[in-house]
Amino acid sequence: MKFKSTPENITLVQNAFQTIQNTTGGISLGRKSLPDSITLIKESVLTSMTKLGNSYPFAVYQDKSNIYHLVYEKGPYLLRKGGDKKTILSVHNLLSKLPLGLFNIAEENGNEELVLEWINKYPDWSPLHVSAAVGLEKYILKESQRSDWEVISCQVDSHDGKTPLHIASEEGNDKIVSLLLQKGCDLSKLDIKGENSIHLASRKGNVECISKMFEFGDLSKNINIENENGETPLHLAISNGQVDVVEYLLLFKESDIHYLKIKGFSKGSILEYGRRIENKNTSIYKCLTLLCQSYPELINEVIDKDKNNILHLSTDKLFLQALLSESHTCTYIDVNATNRFGLTPIHKAILNDNLSILITLYGYGCSINNSDPSGDTPLHYAVRSGNIQIVKALLCFNANIKAINNNGESIMCVLQKSNHSNKDIIKKCLDLFESQGNIQDHTDELERFEQSNSMAYQLKKDIENKKHSVNVLSLDGGGVKGMVIIQILLYIEKRLGSDLMKHFDWISGTSTGGIIAIGLAEEMPLLSIQKLYLRFKDKVFIGERPYNSEVLKKIFIDNFGNKTMAEIKSDKKVFVTTVQGNVCPSELCLFRNYMLPGFSDEINKNRGFFQLNKVPIWKALRCSTAAPTYFEAVDNKYIDGGVMANNPTINTIADIQLYNTALNAKNQKPHEISCILSIGTGKNPKKTVESLNVNLPTGITDVITTARSIINLKNIFLEQLTSADGEPVNRARSWAHTMKSPFFRFSPTFTEDIELDCKDDNVIVNMLWETEKYLRKDGACDVLMLTGFLENFKR
């Protein structure tokens, strides 16, 4: 009869083990405080002591200080020593019962010392336990011929109740596991904690042992057994971060013969179990990701009496990302599920004042406008709680500021009824979004004249000429600050009241701008790109620089597949920049989805036009984003395009001119640039540089000053090398106006430095908020002019 892991049976086993221990006379065998490792002992030391009795090879010696030494005389090895004669003799008596054949085989295999280590730690183990721990296959084969094999193979140790199969599984001796199972050992046997051998192998990550259990044992009937804490082998593998074991166990999900249980555990949801694991590491998060990837429906599982699911209860951002990172795209996951009170996970995050959870949930598709049964939206909750950062985040993510609850209360009305200290600040935030503000033109008279003339020229063109005109969108580099570009595009689109991208024909991007450019060319909605970035930053910027380039590559493949530049979905022309850095001087390269029309492959190649079907989108993006010190160069050759063209506007104009030359050469009508929209990733605040002089130092003060000057000059050099604002913008604007093309540039100035790899949610929210303020104030006039031009430039 199989032993079931019920509380009553576990108590029975525990009582039985206590009886076994009592037979030793209540003597401690050293389990609570294990002895030191065995050591060689000199013969001269032994001869200086008195041997008690004539036993061999285990013997007890007494020194002049009345300290007793347990010795294995073949070494000789000192196993343990102490002043308690009774304990030492008790251990000696146990070891003396071990058969010499065990040691002879251990000597043959060179494992004699290892055997001694084990028996010194666990003197109550049987020879089979020791053999299972060490891997003495020959001894086990010999013992299996005995008539009482069925009895001795099931013997348990007096402390943990483990059989030899338990020990072999725990120690990762897969050959022994295989042998014991083939010789009839029972996989269903439980130790004192109610754990079978699968539990032990899972905890230690011994996936090969579990594989042998599947091959030679009854894995299907024992894979879901719960221990005294309600944990199955899958639970233990997850809590110990054993990724390989979790991957293996998940192979048995819902198959015809084997079924891995994932619900209905005595202690509740396995995801809730995962949430409560303390000090979670990367491996544990990976295990949880694998689980949800295989069983995404677990995310919908109701966990408690309030009908919360795991998304409602999550307060750890990394845990939440682990659950959603590979499963959020599943159509049957309800990320907006409501609990008993009608609250979504976003509502709960706001009640917990947890900005990071809110942003993570939004990034993985949770709605920020769903209301509770009272009609309160997340923004109602946020203004009521008084969390400024959460209010700003919701507004930046386009929360409905005009929402009215069932009591007829607007967002502003709920705020006015609140009594928290942030009331006035939040009112200013709401006012910024509710009013159009006082739109002022911040350009000078000369620039207004050039821009007005250019707009007038383009708007007066006839339909035929307009059809041959192209509107250009150019996107700067800047790492995570690419979210600024997305925020600006979303705002312009909202003001325009229609799909912004239908107005643009030629898109270019550098680094982060390249990602957005490709996303737009692939017809990804702006909100989808925004959410991609919110997920992206926490996946990529992990640990120290340089970051793992393979993670970046995987993100690109997950979103764009293995399509080449030639297979880009829309008919828009697009390119991303990169730099060939393995030559000096370095060379700017463009990965395009177009070639020079009417010219041979050779001429195209000479002009730097790559064969489109040989450049995967993911590789073009990896090259463009390979920022030095942040990510590895691609093919030890290509680095971030921002090194030479962080603002690719001029390069875009030049490329269109080259394309037009090809058209002219083939007697085709060239394209005229009708509008240029250049979007930056924001400017860090200006800083005063105190010293620039580099002289030979004459004293310690001069050394410090010179060192500062060198650092300042280095910073100036790097800033100018990768500059996207200032002169690059002035040159692009001048060139555009020379062609009678209106030029629009948007790039806010921040109040604090923002690093390319920033992933701090508070900093990100402030960055987006300052972008929104800029668009509604300093940039408001340009937004109005741009949207007016696009609406009236009919083609």
Task: Name each region found by the language model.
Residues 150-154, 187, 221-223, 256-260, ...:
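Ankyrin-repeat inter-repeat connecting loop/turn
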Residues 4-147, 167-171, 175-182, 187-192, ...:
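Conserved catalytic cores and adjacent C-terminal regulatory segments
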Residues 124, 160-161, 194, 230, ...:
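Start-of-repeat signature of ankyrin repeats
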Residues 271-272, 311-314:
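Extended, amphipathic alpha-helical scaffolds
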Residues 191, 222-227, 249, 258-264, ...:
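Short, tandemly repeated low-complexity microdomains enriched for cysteine and small residues
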